[in-house]
Amino acid sequence: MQREEGFNTKMADGPDEYETETGCVPLLHPEEIKPQSHYNHGYGEPLGRKTHIDDYSTWDIVKATQYGIYERCRELVEAGYDVRQPDKENVTLLHWAAINNRIDLVKYYISKGAIVDQLGGDLNSTPLHWATRQGHLSMVVQLMKYGADPSLIDGEGCSCIHLAAQFGHTSIVAYLIAKGQDVDMMDQNGMTPLMWAAYRTHSVDPTRLLLTFNVSVNLGDKYHKNTALHWAVLAGNTTVISLLLEAGGNVDAQNVKGESALDLAKQRKNVWMINHLQEARQAKGYDNPSFLRKLKADKEFRQKVMLGTPFLVIWLVGFIADLDIDSWLIKGLMYGGVWATVQFLSKSFFDHSMHSALPLGIYLATKFWMYVTWFFWFWNDLNFLFIHLPFLANSVALFYNFGKSWKSDPGIIKATEEQKKKTIVELAETGSLDLSIFCSTCLIRKPVRSKHCGVCNRCIAKFDHHCPWVGNCVGAGNHRYFMGYLFFLLFMICWMIYGCVSYWGLHCETTYTKDGFWTYITQIATCSPWMFWMFLNSVFHFLWVAVLLMCQLYQITCLGITTNERMNARRYKHFKVTTTSIESPFNHGCVRNIIDFFEFRCCGLFRPVIVDWTRQYTIEYDQISGSGYQLV
């Protein structure tokens, strides 16, 4: 096992033993630091208690503490051993108990007078430092209950939060912040926890967690003025670079040598980092002319461009095709101009962080031109009572359900800053601060069936999926409206297809029965290119809407699961998954599933089970027995 300046883990025959570790050392020459693909902590998991029969009577108290032999330790202490006495390596019993996570011995030694913040070892560290380096959250909690001070620094100038950040112990970072540690605290080397995480931990956490606590992203260290983005580039930490840029990391921030993060990336000839940082500059308009820079800096304007572009493109495609021009060369040049315009808008104004803006714009534009076509092309040709009136009624229902799907709260799990910290402390002190049930971005305990949406960056109760066509997540708060949206949208598209076919029958000369299908397609496309273009759009949307509606109905009715649960069932312990089926604890039969989902009451005939999924943390909730409905 490699040695580092302070700690070592002797794993062949025993538990952790203290030597040296390079954890937190002054980094005075960053140009000498080579990118790392990972960081070896120099630790293994400590061995558990010995389970085989052994003669502990000859063991000294240090070895007995390392292995957690409580009776032997108590025997020696009762015989007069001073629990404050350090061994030949200047390490106390409390240090050994802390690094090996012997909570019962920590309680015992403190009850016998052990000093909770006693310094020891080559690094002059406290037991809390040792427990933090090893990632023993339960030990950190226990020591702090006895008054251990996490703000004390060790011989290398690091407090506990810096150690937890650089070793990737996200739960400990969260607990320390919740207990009052400053998220921007600098160690004696001028490094913040975010800088250490960016340099040492090649995963999304704890960087993501620190960013959620509103850490100062663009703060520079004391000696080199390197920001966290500089340190991430020095380490080749591509995962963290993306997170820092999304959080507003300044690509042009310079250190004492006048170097930006992009300059460091170029020095290391890392193509991915260079491209990513250059894209970030372009997204902020730094490399654009001044008149474009102001527009590009306006996020609301960029969103309007993304929403408005599909309106223009859909119209131009149909308009150019419908022009009375025989030369396809001219039309081809016009289409080339449309393509060039879209490329310019995309490169100059599209914001790829607005994932839903473009699909939402495509949906709104398609429906807008379909309604224009309906009222200006079909209105005089179709029967009002049997066609137009049902179409208008369907449209009202469609607009209502779309609006609710788009703008309703899908089930965002909310908490105040104090509630978040209280949750972290409660989970940590009950041994439940596990990232499988705790969201390191939203800083909340995740209810059952919830999931963090990577697009919206929020935890959603009873999460189904993120739908780009409505620009929102689909969850407990709007899933029923989303089903209504799909249902009425499908009928609207069917009416549109009917209108197109009726128009061709009335206004176009066709010879389908004589010349066949392909000749018919040519005739209707030539007769009215705009109508044919609307027909193609209708068919495209019909296909995905029909498939999605059927899948949703099947999952809701027959399986009792969400799309997320169906795709990730193996990740959840409460699902029984075989090669052919998924058994859901939320499936209560087709009838009951429908009644509960749509909350059917039928004038009191049915009594659906209403569950607040934003606060439901177990699979057990008050259910109505029987077939899923109850006569009242």
UniProtKB/Swiss-Prot annotation:
Function: Palmitoyltransferase that catalyzes the addition of palmitate onto various protein substrates and is involved in a variety of cellular processes. Has no stringent fatty acid selectivity and in addition to palmitate can also transfer onto target proteins myristate from tetradecanoyl-CoA and stearate from octadecanoyl-CoA. Palmitoyltransferase specific for a subset of neuronal proteins, including SNAP25, DLG4/PSD95, GAD2, SYT1 and HTT. Also palmitoylates neuronal protein GPM6A as well as SPRED1 and SPRED3.
Phylogenetic classification of the source organism: Eukaryota, Metazoa, Chordata, Craniata, Vertebrata
Species name: Mus musculus (Mouse)
Record PTM text: Autopalmitoylated. Autopalmitoylation has a regulatory role in ZDHHC17-mediated Mg(2+) transport.
Predominant cellular place of this UniProt entry's protein: Golgi
EC number: 2.3.1.225, 2.3.1.-
Positions of the catalytic residues: C467 (s-palmitoyl cysteine intermediate)
One Pfam family here: DHHC
Protein name listed in UniProt: Palmitoyltransferase ZDHHC17
